From Swiss-Prot:
This is Photosystem I reaction center subunit XI. It comes from Prochlorococcus marinus (strain MIT 9215). Signal peptide: none annotated. The keyword Membrane applies. Its main location: membrane. It comes from the Bacteria.
Length: 199
């Protein structure tokens, strides 16, 4: 304890307030509008995690807790499969439409191979996160996620998530490739390619 703190803790004199600054109409149990929306610490104020109307709101909590990474009752492998499928599916379009081969006849196949390559790179990063010598970082409960999945943040759980991510990512890219190859999209592909043509 510093000398500055000691002077306050050892002081025997009572604190006196100036009467003109005291509002007698406010009672200790009154909750004002500002107090209802005040930012409060979640657990430990030193961590810096605050419960704000954004991260602890109903919509945000419902949205985040329904993502496959935090949804309750599914295995780590299925979490990875669902997350990877979304990544692979969403990566295929930008690689196909804006890739260097976008104006060639190989654009569809090049987009597929690029998306699968990106999924492989992300899978390698997930494997490195679970490298020997360190355990996965266990997320504590916070204002948005009250109950993070315990089975995911183990070595075996993270390995299952990674294998599911690889399979889902490759499958999602192949599914997008199959959709682009349908007859319905053959008429739309030249229009979409001309929108993003840069040269």
């Amino acid at each position: 304890m510093s000398d500055f703190q000691k002077s306050f803790s050892e002081s025997t004199s009572s604190i006196k307030f100036d009467e003109k600054y005291i509002d007698n109409s406010v009672q200790p149990n009154d909750i004002g509008v500002a107090d209802q929306w005040a930012v409060k610490t979640v657990d430990d104020p030193c961590v810096g995690n605050l419960a704000t109307p954004v991260n602890s709101g109903y919509f945000t909590k419902a949205f985040i807790n329904n993502l496959p990474f935090y949804r309750e009752g599914i295995s780590p492998n299925f979490r990875g499969l669902e997350t990877g499928a979304a990544f692979g599916y969403l990566l295929y379009g930008p690689f196909t439409m804006t890739g260097p081969l976008r104006n060639s006849e190989f654009a569809v196949t090049a987009g597929l191979l690029s998306a699968i390559g990106a999924v492989h790179i992300m899978t390698a990063l997930l494997v490195l996160y679970n490298a020997p010598g360190k355990a996965p970082n266990v997320q504590p409960p916070d204002a948005t996620v009250n109950n993070p999945p315990k089975d995911l943040f183990t070595r075996a759980g993270w390995a299952d998530f990674t294998s599911g991510f690889w399979l889902g990512g490759c499958g999602g890219a192949v599914f997008a490739w199959l959709l682009v190859g349908t007859l319905h999209l053959d008429t739309l592909m030249p229009i979409i390619k001309n929108i993003w043509t840069a040269g």
